[in-house]
């Protein structure tokens, strides 16, 4: 996008690869917006999912997973204003540059209003089902300011309570009871991204910090 101000709604950007910047989107001097958009498995030299070079861009109710770059930036703001809100940012490379993030779930945490770090609880991310399980902490976690009327599938978002984070709205107003799990850590383990409740003593994580990034209230660790 160069010198243009498009509006993107209900779109999926998947498996794009660029030798330059912006695996899915490169925005140059653009005043554009992305709502209910999914960015999955995109890669670039810089900004695996998104690269901004001047302008003012917003990402609202977006889901970003497994976007990577050679410089370890999943999103990169080289210059301009970039805002991310009501979104899920999980398993990506880092957010680089000055990015205003609010009401969002960012793996590892990120400074900003009402941001948090917690396993998203996708139905089946490995098979591209990014809808939310009933216990997902994404449910009812969004901002009540200027609520988007529907999600990527056209499902109505809650208008009397807080909407869900990400591109997909669950039918529940609040998450159901969560069943805690036990995570395993060992020197022989591997730090891989987990989206739901997949735990196994035979496939432990390698570090405590990685494990804690995946934990929800009530979970435990065995080292």
Where are these regions (language model features)?
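Flexible, charged surface loops at secondary-structure boundaries
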Residues: 1, 177-179, 213-217
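C-terminal accessory segments
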Residues: 114-169
């Amino acid at each position: 996008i160069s010198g243009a101000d498009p509006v993107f709604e209900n779109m999926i950007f998947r498996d794009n690869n660029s030798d330059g910047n912006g695996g899915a989107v490169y925005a140059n001097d653009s005043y554009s917006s992305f709502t209910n958009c999914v960015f999955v498995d995109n890669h670039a030299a810089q900004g695996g999912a998104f690269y901004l070079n001047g302008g003012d861009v917003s990402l609202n109710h977006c889901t970003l997973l497994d976007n990577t770059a050679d410089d370890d930036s999943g999103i990169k703001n080289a210059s301009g204003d970039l805002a991310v809100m009501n979104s899920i940012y999980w398993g990506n490379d880092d957010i680089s540059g000055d990015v205003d993030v609010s009401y969002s779930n960012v793996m590892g945490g990120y400074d900003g209003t009402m941001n948090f770090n917690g396993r998203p609880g996708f139905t089946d991310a490995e098979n591209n089902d990014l809808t939310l399980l009933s216990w997902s902490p994404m449910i009812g976690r969004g901002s009540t300011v200027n609520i988007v009327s529907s999600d990527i599938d056209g499902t109505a978002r809650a208008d009397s309570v807080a909407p869900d984070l990400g591109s997909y709205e669950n039918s529940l107003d609040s998450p159901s009871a969560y069943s805690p799990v036990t995570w395993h850590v060992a020197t022989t383990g591997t730090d891989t991204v987990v989206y739901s409740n997949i735990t196994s003593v035979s496939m432990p994580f390698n570090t405590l910090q990685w494990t804690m990034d995946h934990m929800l209230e009530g979970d435990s660790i065995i080292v």
